[in-house]
Design a protein with these regions (language model features):
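Extracytoplasmic loops and strand-loop junctions of Gram-negative outer membrane beta-barrel proteins
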Residues: 2-9, 46-51, 101-109, 157-162
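Gram-negative outer-membrane beta-barrel transporters
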Residues: 2-92
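Generic detector of contiguous secondary-structure segments
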Residues: 63-69, 103-106, 128
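Surface-exposed coil/turn segments at beta-strand junctions on protein surfaces, enriched
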Residues: 26, 59, 70, 112-114, ...
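C-terminal beta-signal and adjacent terminal beta-strands/loops
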Residues: 83-99, 117-118, 124-173
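Residues that define the transmembrane beta-barrel architecture of outer-membrane proteins
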Residues: 14-18, 60-64, 115-119, 133, ...
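A subset of signal/propeptide-processing and intrinsically disordered low-complexity segments
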Residues: 16, 36, 115, 138-141
């Protein structure tokens, strides 16, 4: 749903998504790597809303992912990187944020969150416990650089009749 001026509006619409995906995958002996790039343009269309067309809530224009893994006998290590442009959101009008009891928003999805970036690492060791039982032990670190990735942002009016910002963040270390 919407977290802006259309939050409580019931309307039927559609969306169009166009884009390109590229994948490069290469294996070198014990190392396997891949790299992807995606470009996407996702746009909503609602005949009875103004404006009638605006970016989709998940309109992430550019996305890059890279991963590589190394295997040697019973040992495996992997690393990955994920980056993408920020998704759209709607800010209140800076000069006049509240009209009556409602937030006065800018055009829908006209702002973008900061870019998202994450680096992950993992290691795993496989070993036999007996002739019939195999075991694995491993560890992984998600968001190794502990980036402060904001994945959503919305607004509410607090008890003091001020606009309050809420941010949803991805996991850190």
């Amino acid at each position: 749903g919407f977290l802006n001026q259309f939050q409580f509006v019931r309307s039927a619409g559609s969306y169009t998504a166009t884009g390109l995906d590229f994948l490069i995958n290469k294996k070198f002996n014990r190392i396997s790597s891949w790299l992807t790039y995606s470009y996407a343009d996702n746009t909503y269309a609602f005949n009875d809303l103004v404006p009638s067309a605006f970016p989709n809530n998940l309109d992430i224009r550019h996305s890059i992912a890279f991963a590589s893994s190394f295997t040697h006998e019973r040992f495996e290590a992997s690393a990955g990187l994920k980056w993408h442009t920020g998704k759209p959101f709607t800010k209140p009008v800076e000069t006049d944020p509240i009209t009556g009891n409602t937030i006065n928003y800018e055009a829908p999805n006209s702002s973008r969150l900061e870019d998202y970036m994450r680096v992950d690492l993992s290691v795993k060791y496989n070993f036999p416990l007996s002739t019939r039982i195999n075991a694995q032990i491993g560890a992984s670190v998600w968001n190794l650089l502990d980036n402060n990735n904001i994945i959503d942002q919305y607004y509410r009016i607090n008890d003091s009749n001020e606009v309050q910002v809420f941010q949803q963040k991805a996991l850190g270390i």
